[in-house]
Regions:
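Core catalytic alpha/beta fold that binds nucleotide/phospho-ligands
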Residues: 1-212
Length: 212
């Protein structure tokens, strides 16, 4: 049921399904802790499916006693703090990652929206280096989706509240053709490595602080 992907020091578990709220309710009865069930009763069907799907993945891996909690900025963490985690979902794809290091993941279904609104999150320098130069993929729409997803995973990796995707994150390829990022935030500079997987109907990006 779960796809298991390894990326450096991160393990990502993916579940793809098209279950509705009534379909997935039986999973909620089994996999969701009593403490969390109260918070699921009054949310919309889409959010219910997203939250339960991620908790099913967690249950399969660590059991029912471990819960997903959220800090003041909305970032998820495990109740036992055994691992750092990150969560993402898009149109029937649900992802949960684990690592002993802070990190971020994002999954985006292939679409044309990212290309249409690219000026909101990508600079001309990034477009020239990564899209026009075919550094990510031969398909422009997929390249823009990957840039957007990479910046989402970077944002999640460090709780960068208020960070500008366009002006605060610069993506490029290093000398070994790896995707790297420089983040400018509150007069400080951070460096990240981003791994990406071009899947049949979506892109998955995984971000970790760059090794020093």
């Amino acid at each position: 049921m779960l796809d298991n992907l390894a990326a450096n020091e991160v393990r990502v578990f993916l579940w793809h399904h098209k279950l509705s709220r009534p379909d997935i309710q039986e999973y909620a009865d089994i996999c969701v802790s009593a403490e969390e069930k109260g918070g699921l009763s009054n949310i919309c069907d889409k959010r219910f499916v997203e939250k339960v799907s991620v908790r099913v993945i967690l249950y399969k891996l660590l059991g029912k006693d471990v819960r997903i909690c959220y800090n003041e900025n909305g970032a998820p963490y495990l109740s036992n703090k055994q691992y750092y985690i990150s969560i993402s979902h898009t149109d029937g794809h649900f992802a949960l990652s684990f690592s002993h290091r802070k990190h971020g993941i994002d999954i985006e279904r292939w679409n044309s929206t990212a290309k249409r609104v690219s000026k909101m999150f990508a600079t001309e320098q990034e477009v020239a280096a990564l899209v026009d130069a075919k550094a990510i993929t031969d398909e422009d729409a997929k390249a823009f989706c990957t840039i957007w997803s990479a910046k989402e995973s970077i944002y999640k990796s460090h709780d960068f509240a208020g960070l500008s995707f366009r002006d605060g994150i610069l993506l490029k390829k290093d000398a070994f053709s790896n995707l790297v990022a420089e983040v400018s935030y509150k007069e400080a500079t951070f460096h990240y490595a981003v791994e990406y997987r071009l899947l049949p109907d979506c892109v998955l990006t995984i971000c970790l602080p760059a090794s020093v």
